[in-house]
């Protein structure tokens, strides 16, 4: 397999599709910040961050023209994808000003299932042999993204830009939902209302409680497990009381599995066990209500189709000539 990573190539000028959609999301959320300026916690810093991201994007475009090759193209796209770790907690800065809706979703969950599956699951299976595989699956989320993207880069470079665009666009669609649908999930909501209320099926509204309280208590499972502690550490760093409905972990991993299936059945087969564990883990570690995960799965197909259509309709151009 001749990669020719550093071989100079003829390339089109301008922004890649994934950079364009990032700038569009950047602009849309900047406008939203201006509308909500008086209510937001640190709007000036958020706007400054967006200016830096836009400036960095155009700088990378310029530097790429000095040495256009597959590797520098990968770097440009990888940087945009890495910014998802910024855009995700950024959604909380918007939805923290809206009344929390967890009481609605917990009540629907109670009505549909006669209780809380997120509580049942971890209470019935607290042992290491259940906890560790599920936490491993949950932690595998970002490696799964990396594996699919790198596979397309190495083996189907002609589809690399499309795949990266669809992934980032799908994330942005979920993020826009999270901005306007403030649901934190059981891991934040249940400690806030107390276990007695949960056991009795009473789910009070907590208003803007998470505007001032973002503490995340240790989750359920085998507390001495290696993967349990990996998940706990990553959540303490990057998790916020946001993004529960629908589950982007389930939704995006489903999008990735669609891409894996279309690209390589062997890749799909290798990822499938981790995918199943990841989906189960969203409820097991109480990151999501079961309805979040179900809607995440169903929504993935529509979002994949929409993002693919957007690429073909407005953004499709060959990266290299």
Where in the sequence are the language-model features?
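N-terminal transmembrane-helix/juxtamembrane module of multi-pass inner/ER membrane proteins
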Residues: 2-52, 71-146
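Membrane-interface helix-boundary motifs at transmembrane edges
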Residues: 11-12, 40-44, 63-75, 152-163, ...
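Membrane-interface loop-to-helix entry segments
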Residues: 130-144, 240-259, 290, 294
């Amino acid at each position: 397999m001749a990669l020719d990573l550093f071989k100079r190539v003829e390339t089109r000028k301008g922004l890649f599709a994934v950079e364009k959609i990032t700038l569009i999301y950047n602009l849309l959320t900047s406008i939203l910040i201006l509308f909500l300026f008086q209510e937001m916690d640190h709007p000036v810093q958020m706007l400054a961050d967006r200016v830096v991201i836009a400036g960095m994007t155009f700088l990378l475009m310029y530097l790429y023209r000095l040495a256009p090759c597959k590797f520098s193209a990968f770097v440009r796209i990888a940087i945009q994808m890495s910014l998802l770790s910024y855009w995700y907690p950024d959604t909380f800065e918007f939805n923290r000003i809206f009344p929390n809706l967890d009481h609605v979703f917990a009540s629907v969950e109670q009505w549909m299932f006669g209780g809380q599956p997120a509580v049942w699951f971890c209470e019935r299976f607290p042992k290491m042999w259940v906890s560790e595989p599920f936490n491993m699956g949950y932690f595998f989320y970002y490696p799964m993204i990396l594996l699919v993207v790198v596979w397309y880069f190495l083996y189907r470079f002609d589809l690399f830009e499309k795949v990266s665009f669809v992934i980032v666009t799908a994330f942005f669609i979920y993020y826009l939902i999270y901005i306007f649908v403030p649901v934190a999930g059981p891991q934040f909501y249940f400690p806030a209302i107390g276990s007695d209320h949960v056991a009795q099926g009473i789910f009070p509204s907590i208003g803007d409680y998470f505007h001032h309280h973002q503490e995340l208590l240790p989750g359920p499972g085998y507390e001495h497990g290696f993967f349990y502690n990996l998940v706990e550490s990553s959540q303490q760093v990057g998790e916020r009381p946001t993004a529960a409905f629908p589950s982007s972990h389930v939704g995006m991993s489903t999008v990735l599995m669609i891409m894996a299936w279309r690209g390589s059945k062997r890749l799909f087969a290798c990822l499938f066990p981790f995918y199943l564990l990841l989906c189960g883990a969203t409820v097991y570690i109480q990151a999501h209500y079961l309805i979040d995960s179900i809607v995440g799965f169903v929504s993935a197909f529509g979002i994949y189709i929409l993002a693919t259509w957007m690429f073909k309709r407005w953004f499709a151009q060959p990266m290299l000539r």
